[in-house]
Each structure stands twice: as structure tokens, then as C-alpha cells.
Amino acid sequence: MKNFQIISDIEKDLHHETASEIKRYLESHGKCAKIVGSSSEVTQIDWADLVIVLGGDGYVIQAAKRFAGSHVPIFGVNFGTLGFLTEVEKPRIQKALYEILSGNYEVEKRMALTGRVQKTSVGEAIGIAINEFIIGKQDFGHMITANVYVDDELMDTYVADGILLMSCCRELDTRFELKYI
């Protein structure tokens, strides 16, 4: 790996202090690194071999959605609370970077959900999710009827106040579709 894009949550990494340390470390090892404050500031990502995201799970999800389809791996450093989607905590960054630069890593592919909600009176909404989709009713007193499809095959029909569809981080290429009746 030679080129690194660093995305740093300015609220959690005051003045990009940690991002700047990472950049200096990478450059001292002959690598190229660029820092931005959010994934929306990145206009092109294909030049990078790795995206390093400093923040919580929300920042990792934002980057994963933004770069979906680019095939550039994302390495998350937890600056948040739980860090389900991040790889390391802040104190272990330098050791992790050393391992990455030494080639001691594996790229883990994680599933992204593509969801499509159709409602005859409103139309269609399509979204990408890393963790889950939550679909709820709009009106009090009315339940929703949802046909749930997995890879274009009807899985089941549900009548409920809402539905929660969650991803499994080890599977690939699964799409959920909800069709209101």
C-alpha cells in the first residue's frame, strides 16, 4: 500500500491532531497521505489504496456508503463509544499502521444492504445500509404489510407496526426489498 486517504471527525480529533500524526508516520515510511474532515469532501477515491476513518461507527458507515462500489478498503479507528465497525482504538494506531505497512493484514468484505421501499401513493425510495434498515408506519392506527425479498426472491410477508432488517457482516451481495401492499 502506498496511498492513503485519512478522514477525520474534526469534533473528535481536535484540529486533526491524530490524523496529522498518522500522515507524518505514513510519509516517514515513503507513503502518500491526504487528510479531509468528512467523506463528502473526497471527490475521487480510486487513487487510494486504503481509507483510514477516525471517528465512530457513524463516520465509518458514512464513508462506506460514500465509497460503495469503489473497492477501496476502509480501516476504522474508534473515536466513538462502541466501535462495532472499527478495527482499533486510538492508542493502538501506530502498531496497526506498522502491521498494515508490513503486509500483515486481511481485507474483510462486509455486506451492504440495498433496500427498496415501494408505496403506491408515494413512489419508490432506494437506500444503502451497512447495519440495518428500519421501516415504520407513517400513520397511527394503521399497520404496514410488507413483502420482504432477498435477492429478488420473496422471503415472507409481514403485517406489523414496523420491520427491522439487519445485516450479517460476513455475507456478500444480498439485497432486501420491501414492497408495501
Q: Across the structure, where does each feature detected by a protein language model lie?
A:
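Catalytic core of DAGKc-family lipid kinases
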Residues: 84-162
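Gly/Ser/Thr-rich active-site loops/lids in small-molecule metabolic enzymes
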Residues: 158-181
